Design a protein with these regions (language model features):
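Domain-level signal for soluble alpha/beta catalytic cores
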Residues: 1-395
Length: 395
């Protein structure tokens, strides 16, 4: 993984805006109306273009924009997750939407995930979440959410091979030495219905074992693997009633263990982990504090950790690193521009945010990044302006 003592390197969290042509092609493909060869050709060209634009914006460690993860609408908060439904065998479409699953309430000694409709922030601000004009948004209503009904297996070999080929060709065409590709973590992949495995923990480990094939393919291709597992922090909001920090940490550890099981034998210096509290536009008053989970995050077998630090709910948590020892062989990717606002950060603010972390962990151990993916969350014109200001502020 690249590091530099001469300058602050830049990257981002993964998702970037798709061109209208790719969004429409994805929509038509989902309806079975696209010639597959023509689609793959257009996808490859789009990946080449998005890498070129990242380099032009000043991004040192680019990604493929998650273009291989289908997004059939301009506003989309779930492509990073829902892509896995087409790459895992053992799932069955239910006809239910994301918010239609039954409520599961926790009790002392029995902490469980409830439904998405029973999330505490949503219940606290029910009027705002229910008002289309409020500015609160979780994206288009997701339908046809799957349930696991048979042993899980990884079936996405052709898809990940195509993603890798497209990205490596784009990196070579733009003379870029290193790039990253995202893959969903087991804690998040398992947040669907389970009618097959005997326990939630067994299901999480099954997801880990299946997704390991994708992790290994990315690393074996010479790319940086980024594990996207917002559930490690975000699940806190989906447990009702609110658990104590210690109860939540205990609930989360099997998900950490499952991920480490999936990463076994893979070089840590080729892996980065992305933590966030969910990228929807909402109040986020029920987010767990970073200080309560930072040590849990650091138990993940990765060489770098990406996390939100550039929005009004979590920016103050830079101070957590005053008392948290970052292992000597690790680096961090703090978010210093955010998906959570249409306001484009001033380069001087970006520089201030970077400087805070540099004063605590050292310049050579920071890669300046975004809070979360920008694609599907802010307008494309704004997203690219944010990447440019990120590079300017980190310079």
């Amino acid at each position: 993984m690249q590091a530099s003592s001469d300058r602050i390197l830049t990257s981002h969290a993964g998702s970037l805006p798709r061109p209208d042509s790719l969004i429409e092609a994805n929509h038509q493909r989902e309806a079975g109306k696209v010639d597959e060869a023509a689609f793959q050709k257009s996808l490859s060209a789009a990946v080449g273009d998005v890498v070129r634009r990242q380099v032009a914006a000043g991004i040192a460690v680019p990604g493929d924009g998650e273009y291989g993860k289908s997004m059939g609408s301009k506003v989309n908060y779930r492509a990073w997750w829902s892509y896995s439904f087409t790459r895992l065998g053992g799932l069955k479409v239910t006809g239910l939407g994301l918010y239609d699953f039954p409520v599961r309430r926790s009790s002392p000694g029995n902490v469980v995930l409830s439904s998405f409709g029973d999330r505490r922030d949503r219940l606290r601000f029910a009027e705002a979440y229910g008002d289309r004009d409020s500015g609160v948004s979780t994206g288009p209503r997701a339908t046809d959410w799957p349930v696991c009904v048979a042993p899980l297996s990884y079936t996405g070999h052709a898809a990940i091979a195509a993603d890798i080929a497209n990205f490596k060709a784009a990196l070579a065409a733009n003379n870029v030495a290193e790039g990253f590709m995202t893959s969903i973590g087991p804690g998040s992949a398992s947040r669907i219905g389970n009618d097959h495995y005997k326990s939630d923990e067994e299901f999480v480990f099954a997801c880990a074992e299946a997704m390991r094939e994708e992790y290994k393919a990315i690393v074996d291709a010479g790319l940086i693997l980024q594990i996207d597992d917002p559930a490690i922090a975000e699940n806190f909001d989906q447990i009702n009633p609110e658990p104590t920090a210690e109860e939540y940490r205990k609930f989360t550890m099997p998900r950490i263990e499952a991920l480490n099981h999936a990463l076994r034998g893979l070089p840590k210096d080729r892996i980065r982990f992305h933590l966030c509290w969910g990228s929807w536009h909402g109040p986020h008053t029920t987010d767990i504090a970073m200080r309560d989970i930072v040590d849990v995050m650091l138990r993940i077998d990765a060489g770098a950790y990406s996390f939100e630090a550039g929005n009004v709910r979590h920016e103050h948590e830079w101070s957590v690193w005053k008392d948290t020892k970052l292992p000597d062989d690790k680096v961090i990717l703090p978010g210093v521009v955010s998906h959570a606002t249409n306001v484009v950060e001033h380069p001087e603010l970006v520089a201030e945010r970077v400087g805070r972390f540099a004063s605590l962990v050292g310049r050579e151990r920071i890669i300046a990044s975004t809070d979360c993916g920008l694609g599907g969350r802010v307008h494309p014109q704004i997203a690219w302006a944010k990447l440019e200001t990120l590079a300017q502020g980190a310079a």
